[in-house]
Design a protein with these regions (language model features):
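Extracellular loop-to-transmembrane helix junctions
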Residues: 1-19, 72-102, 111, 445-453
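Membrane-interface loop-to-helix entry segments
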Residues: 5, 9-27, 119, 129, ...
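Helix-loop-helix module between adjacent transmembrane segments
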Residues: 10-15, 90-106, 110-175, 235-239, ...
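Membrane-interface "cap" regions at the ends of multi-pass membrane proteins
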Residues: 10-66, 229, 259
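Hydrophobic, membrane-embedded alpha-helices of multi-pass small-molecule transporters
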Residues: 47-64, 201-207, 216-278, 323-332
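Loop-to-transmembrane helix boundary motifs in multi-pass membrane proteins
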Residues: 120-127, 131, 158-162, 266-275, ...
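Hydrophobic alpha-helical segments and their helix-loop junctions in multi-pass secondary transporters
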Residues: 138-142, 146-163, 171-172, 191-218, ...
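Extracellular/periplasmic helix-exit of transmembrane alpha-helices
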Residues: 203-213, 265-307
Length: 470
């Protein structure tokens, strides 16, 4: 219990101190934001700050900090450390920078921002990378809820898929204040209530369960290595490239740059809290990582979430679990397709104020998502996890270049360059040894990951610090 409370306190302190430091470095101004200057009534619309925060939280969270945290809990309480320090020094910085830079670039999608600061080659890579990731996210958060609804109702999963797709169509096409701004705050509140309800149940010892204290021991039932597998598995609970595709959506709705820290950094810290709660629930509810692994293998993560909610919160928990497990991923999926539409629109220069022009992009994207939904969920999730963290790495390097150019003469770029280097090691090491990667031995993948990260760092220094000195 004390380990959990200590980690929870660190997240709060991280927001208050490190989040403030990052915000101070960026020097927010009172210049009119894109929401105020453009205000097209579709994507650029000034919204109340509390509503922007709740939409941002639900956009980036969904089931990410739940599924990822439960998966990370298989390694034991050591996952707490990655959630806490990853959130403060990588995830919070990543989300704040992607939102703030987009805010200062007229709400441009992240691929356009990357292209401006890393060059035309990276622009094309990021456009493709972003659209692929967003469609994967939309597909992942389409099939999970559809399958669970089929289990609960006895209806054909395909029918539920079509219903979810129909909702995606409306949410992707309609102005952001028609569906998303009206219902997301409610679902976001349910997500928070579910998480805090479980936290209080954990602290109260409901069901006679005892929270294990922090240990660095690898408790994975199959003895899989913590490095780099746990760092990829936790994903959204610590740092997530998907968030950078969502932040521009809310950058187009913020009334002031001074609101960026509570909205972007704050939402990431809130997600870190949710992930910490679910990681603690995972290592506590099933009494051992072996029990958690057996539950996840037997009934899957959707049902495991349901069991934990009901076990800790009773009937109320089951209702919230239904809202969380079904509504939250759907709300992540619809904004994923919306972001994909906007990314493609920026790519080809297609104005999106006209409904017909929005249809040109929305229909084929949803069609691809529908086709991908027929592929095994586990396969899609594995590729999503690596793609997600790789995008985070690229965005952090973009932030480092932006900060070097914007704040010349200071070392402010280190705020982004250090986590960018770390994530470079994580992502390259993982893909070199993973089943869906090159399947190299750890004796090769471990040193190779550090070598690749060193190369990325050298390239960054070459086009910034070393170029200036020469």
């Amino acid at each position: 219990m004390y380990s959990f409370l200590g980690c929870l306190a660190l997240l709060v302190v991280g927001f208050l101190i490190y989040g403030k430091l990052v915000d101070t470095v960026f020097k927010p101004t009172d210049e009119p934001t894109p929401a105020v200057r453009i205000n097209d009534g579709v994507d650029y619309i000034p919204l109340p700050t509390w509503k922007v925060f709740m939409i941002q939280l639900l956009n980036i969270a969904g089931l990410g900090p739940i599924f990822g945290a439960l998966g990370g809990a298989l390694w034991g309480p050591s996952v707490y450390l990655w959630i806490v320090f990853g959130t403060i020094f990588a995830g919070g910085v990543h989300d704040y920078m992607s939102g703030m830079i987009s805010l200062r670039e007229n709400g441009k999608s992240i691929s356009e921002v990357v292209g401006k600061y890393l060059g035309s080659l990276m622009l094309h890579i990021m456009r493709l990378f972003s659209v692929v990731l967003l469609v994967l996210v939309g597909t992942v958060f389409m099939t999970g809820p559809a399958n669970l609804l089929a289990m609960l109702t006895g209806m054909d999963p395909t029918m539920w898929l079509l219903i979810v797709l129909a909702y995606y169509f409306l949410a992707t096409l309609l102005p952001i204040d028609t569906l998303i701004a009206r219902f997301y705050p409610l679902f976001g509140a349910c997500l928070l209530i579910m998480a805090f309800g479980i936290m209080f149940a954990l602290l109260a010892g409901v069901g006679g369960h005892t929270m294990p204290e922090l240990t660095l021991q690898n408790l994975h039932p199959k003895d899989l290595p913590i490095w780099p597998l746990m760092f990829i598995t936790v994903a959204c609970g610590a740092v997530s490239g998907f968030h950078s595709t969502q932040s521009p959506l809310m950058a187009r709705c913020l009334k002031s740059e001074r609101l960026a820290r509570p909205v972007f950094y704050g939402a990431m810290v809130a997600e870190g809290v949710i992930a910490l709660v679910w990681a603690a629930a995972g290592v506590t509810f099933y009494d051992s990582t072996g029990g958690l692994a057996a539950a996840m293998a037997d009934v899957g993560q959707n049902k495991a979430v349901y069991e934990i909610c009901v076990g800790f919160m009773g009937y109320v928990g089951s209702v919230l679990a239904m809202l969380g497990v079904i509504a939250c991923p759907i709300t992540s999926g619809d904004t994923a397709f919306r972001s994909a539409r906007l990314t493609l629109a920026d790519w080809i220069g297609l104005e999106q104020g006209n409904k017909v022009k929005r249809l040109y992009l929305a229909l084929p994207l949803l069609a691809v998502g529908g086709l991908l939904s027929q592929i095994n969920f586990t396969i899609i999730w594995r590729y999503f996890a690596w793609t997600n963290q790789t995008l985070a790495m690229i965005v952090l390097w973009t932030g480092a270049v932006y900060m070097y150019r914007k704040f010349k003469g200071s070392k402010a770029y280190l705020i982004a360059a250090i986590p960018a280097t770390f994530m470079s090691v994580v992502t390259t090491t993982y893909i070199l040894q993973a089943k869906e990667g090159l399947q190299l031995s750890t004796s090769i993948s471990y040193p190779a990951g550090f070598v690749f990260a060193a190369i990325f760092l050298f390239l960054f220094l070459r086009v910034t610090v070393l170029k200036k000195e020469s």
